[in-house]
C-alpha cells in the first residue's frame, strides 16, 4: 500500500504538524505501508529534512508562499502512483492539489483538519476562511473518503461544521523519552536551583500566555520564589513583544524568561530539565507538547480546551481555567505539591502515553482505516459513520 502525505511545510515552520505528520508517516511505514511525503519548501526545509529520514520527502519551491502554491506539487503527486492520500491542514493550496489528485486518479484521500475546524480557530481571520471555504475548502472536505479527528471533541466540531463523512478518531502520538540520559540545555542553562515551569509552543494569542503572566503576578512571592516560568517558542504577529512588555511592567525580568524557539535536542533537553509543563490555551486540536511532556514523565497543567480529558481522569494533569485567577489557582496547587507528588503525576502521564499515545499503536490504527477505505470489510473501531 502506497500512502502519500501532503502538508504545506515539512519544516519547523509548520509548528506542531512538523512533529505529528512526521511521526504518523513513520508509524504508518512501520505498519507495513510505504510513505511518500510532499510539501512546500521554506527557509527551514534544508535543515529539517534530515529529521524525516528514512522517508522519501519531496519539496517544491512556491510561487505564492502565503498560500503555499507551487505549480510542481500536483504533477509530482499524480506521478507517484499512490493508493491513498493523507492531507493535513486547511486553507492552503494543498487542499486544491489534493482534490486535483483525487479527480484525476479516482483514488481516495483522508483529510486531517488538525484542529482547524474548532470554533475558536474558525473565528480567527474568519472572513478569509469563509471565502476559502466557499471557493474550495468545503468541497475538499465533503469529498474526503474519511475525516480524521484527533479526539472526540474535534469529531463533534467537524459534525457541527456540517460534515457528514465518516470520521476516524485517532490521536497524535509521541515516542517515550529516554529517561536514562542526562539532559543538557546548552543554549539556555539556568544558573540557579529554581524549579522550572515550562511553556513550549507558538507565541500566539490563542495560547493565552498574557493571562498566564497575569496569573504569575497573582501568585504570592512565597510560592513563586523557588520557580521560574520559562517560555519557549517562536513569535507570531508580534505577540512576543506584547508578552515581554507585560513581564517588564510586572518586574518579572528574572522570574519569567523567554528562551526563543527550541527544536531537536534543545527541545528534548527542555523537557528533561523542567519540573512541569503548562498549556493555558483557549483552543487546541490535540497538543503534542503535552504528550511530549508526559513522555518525559513531567506533570502538566492544562485547560480542558486541550482536549486530553484522559490526563485528568488518570491524574496525569491538573486542570486550569483560562482566566488569570483560575490559572493562578492551578499554579498554587502545583507549587504546594511535594516533589514526590509531582513525580507521581508525571509518571502517570508517561504510563498514559505508553498505553494510548504511542506511535506504533497509532500507526496500526491508521493502517486499518486505510485498508477499510481501499477494500471495505469490517468498520474499524476508530471510525464513526
Task: Name each region found by the language model.
Residues 282:
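Aromatic "clamp/platform" in nucleotide-sugar-dependent glycosyltransferases that forms part
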Residues 104, 130-146:
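Membrane-proximal helix-turn-helix segments that form the acceptor-binding/catalytic region
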Amino acid at each position: 500500500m502506497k500512502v502519500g502525505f501532503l502538508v504545506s511545510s515539512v519544516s519547523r515552520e509548520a509548528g506542531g504538524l512538523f512533529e505529528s505528520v512526521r511521526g504518523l508517516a513513520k508509524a504508518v511505514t512501520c505498519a507495513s505501508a510505504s510513505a511518500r511525503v510532499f510539501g512546500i519548501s521554506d527557509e527551514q526545509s534544508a535543515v529539517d529534512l534530515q529529521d524525516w529520514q528514512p522517508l522519501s520527502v519531496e519539496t517544491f519551491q512556491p510561487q505564492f508562499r502565503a498560500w503555499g502554491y507551487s505549480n510542481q506539487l500536483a504533477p509530482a503527486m499524480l506521478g507517484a502512483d499512490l493508493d491513498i492520500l493523507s492531507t493535513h491542514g486547511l486553507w492552503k493550496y494543498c487542499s486544491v492539489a489534493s482534490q486535483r489528485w483525487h479527480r484525476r486518479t479516482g483514488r481516495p484521500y483522508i483529510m486531517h483538519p488538525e484542529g482547524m475546524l474548532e470554533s475558536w480557530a474558525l473565528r480567527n481571520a474568519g472572513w478569509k476562511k469563509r471565502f476559502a471555504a466557499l471557493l474550495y475548502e468545503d468541497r475538499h472536505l465533503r469529498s474526503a473518503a474519511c475525516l480524521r479527528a484527533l479526539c472526540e471533541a474535534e469529531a463533534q466540531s467537524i459534525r457541527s461544521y456540517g460534515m457528514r463523512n465518516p470520521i476516524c478518531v485517532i490521536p497524535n502520538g509521541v515516542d517515550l523519552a529516554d529517561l536514562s540520559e542526562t539532559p543538557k540545555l546548552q543554549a539556555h542553562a539556568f544558573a540557579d536551583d529554581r524549579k522550572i515551569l515550562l511553556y513550549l509552543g507558538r507565541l500566539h494569542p490563542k495560547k493565552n500566555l498574557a493571562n498566564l503572566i497575569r496569573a504569575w503576578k497573582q501568585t504570592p512571592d512565597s510560592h513563586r520564589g523557588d520557580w521560574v516560568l520559562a517560555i519557549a517558542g517562536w513569535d507570531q504577529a508580534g505577540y512576543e513583544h506584547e508578552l515581554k512588555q507585560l513581564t517588564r511592567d510586572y518586574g518579572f525580568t528574572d522570574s519569567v524568561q523567554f528562551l526563543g524557539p527550541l527544536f531537536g535536542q534543545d527541545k528534548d533537553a527542555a523537557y528533561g530539565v523542567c519540573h512541569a509543563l503548562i498549556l493555558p490555551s483557549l483552543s487546541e486540536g490535540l497538543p503534542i507538547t503535552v504528550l511530549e511532556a508526559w513522555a518525559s514523565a513531567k506533570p502538566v497543567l492544562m485547560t480542558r480546551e486541550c482536549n486530553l480529558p484522559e490526563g485528568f481522569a488518570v491524574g496525569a494533569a491538573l486542570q486550569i481555567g483560562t482566566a488569570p485567577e483560575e490559572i493562578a489557582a492551578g499554579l498554587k496547587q502545583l507549587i504546594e505539591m511535594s516533589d514526590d507528588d509531582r513525580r507521581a503525576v508525571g509518571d502517570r502521564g508517561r504510563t498514559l502515553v505508553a498505553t494510548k499515545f504511542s506511535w506504533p499503536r497509532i500507526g496500526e490504527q491508521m493502517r486499518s482505516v486505510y485498508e477499510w477505505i481501499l477494500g471495505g470489510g469490517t468498520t474499524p473501531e476508530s471510525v464513526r459513520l
